[in-house]
């Protein structure tokens, strides 16, 4: 890990701030979520939403997407230069759900982008408040991570679907800034780089000319972001090589895929933040809570506290299980899609099931779905304990590259041991040891072979009672470690079929 001195905390990235002390960070993060809350309240007024309609997570998502679209300058410029029939580039919209005569009905609203920008700025003391926009993007990204497995995207770039725990933030837009880069997984960065290299191989002009120079700068910047996520010298040295390559091609792609595989054991440092839907901040602001004065943190007790007393509803399709829908949203709120299910279950206080056993589809409702049969139910987003979010891959001691947990990218800084079948993973590395980086490859493989599964990750770190806001009495949970607790695969359960 680079010395912490050179790193800004992710709250600072989140709020675009320079160095601040803890109180200033809490205040500026508070200002950010307070602005989101004020914006949401104003939008509910504009759209004449009742209290219950304003607490509907689907309405929250539509409003969030509208404001993100209003500030998407690149796309707006593109739309204005390439007008398509029947679409006004100056407007954006989406489905708003209202309660009419005991039924939920869908209404498509259209809104002026300029007007949305005005309302957003007004809620944020006249500023653009990019940090708040990024925060919403990360919430959407976390929801996607909990809902979908990006198997096809993996296969397209030549990666293995078993690497799904490296794919945090794979749907984050490019414009999500430093805060977005902090939450992207190793696999996500590798995938972005591979796509870029492939374009360069297919398009002779990709790296040439004035545009090519900018492309090259972007390529090197992405390499540096990925390098910063690795915690061992050999992995970093390999990234330097990929970055400095004169003409990136298949050799670099091979190296990147190798590095992604190595990250299954030698875990990268990926940040986790609890980003909640806008309506949750809106509810708190409406009840008179002053986020800026009280201060707020995305990685401490605050989001747990907020969810303890927020009532959020969701539309439920006829054959969906409301408890399963709640689990999906709870995981998204805490960025826990790649956390060990046993750790999540302990914190939540109810059993968290693998994705394959959930009878629920995504949160958003497609425009062709029948509203007649749609019900709504309250999402259960409360927890029994809280825990500090981590940015480390769960490596115990930085001196020796000890293992992180395979198929799990830890979200919570909670002690667990590392059950993994080293043979399974090492099988991924049979194949070509040749190539120009064979010495580094050998070094990385040696570290992986020497990492001991009996090591404990996050030694002594525990969870805390919700009354323990200063985190004074850690409770170290004990887990049945007989099997891996991966949400997407390591479950020994039957395949779930509808």
From Swiss-Prot:
Q: Which UniProt keywords apply?
A: Capsid protein, Helical capsid protein, Host nucleus, Host-virus interaction, Ribonucleoprotein, RNA-binding, Viral nucleoprotein, Viral penetration into host nucleus, Virion, Virus entry into host cell
Q: In which residues does the motif Unconventional nuclear localization signal occur? A: 1-18
Query: Which molecular function GO terms apply here?
Result: RNA binding; structural molecule activity
Description of how the protein assembles with itself and partners? Homomultimerizes to form the nucleocapsid. May bind host exportin-1/XPO1. Binds to viral genomic RNA. Protein-RNA contacts are mediated by a combination of electrostatic interactions between positively charged residues and the phosphate backbone and planar interactions between aromatic side chains and bases.
Write out the ranges of the annotated region (Disordered): 1-22
For this UniProt entry, what is the primary localization, expressed as one broad class?
A: virion
Q: Where is this motif: Bipartite nuclear localization signal?
A: 198-216
The keyword Ribonucleoprotein belongs to this UniProt entry's keyword annotation: yes
Q: Which Pfam families does UniProt cross-reference here? A: Flu_NP (PF00506)
**Descriptive protein name:** Nucleoprotein
Q: Which residues form the signal peptide?
A: none
Compartment(s) of residence: Virion; Host nucleus
Where does this protein come from, organism-wise? Influenza A virus (strain A/Gull/Massachusetts/26/1980 H13N6)
Q: Which InterPro entries match?
A: Flu_NP
What is the recorded function of this protein according to its Swiss-Prot or TrEMBL entry? Answer: Encapsidates the negative strand viral RNA, protecting it from nucleases. The encapsidated genomic RNA is termed the ribonucleoprotein (RNP) and serves as template for transcription and replication. The RNP needs to be localized in the host nucleus to start an infectious cycle, but is too large to diffuse through the nuclear pore complex. NP comprises at least 2 nuclear localization signals that are responsible for the active RNP import into the nucleus through cellular importin alpha/beta pathway.
Q: Does the keyword Cell division apply?
A: no
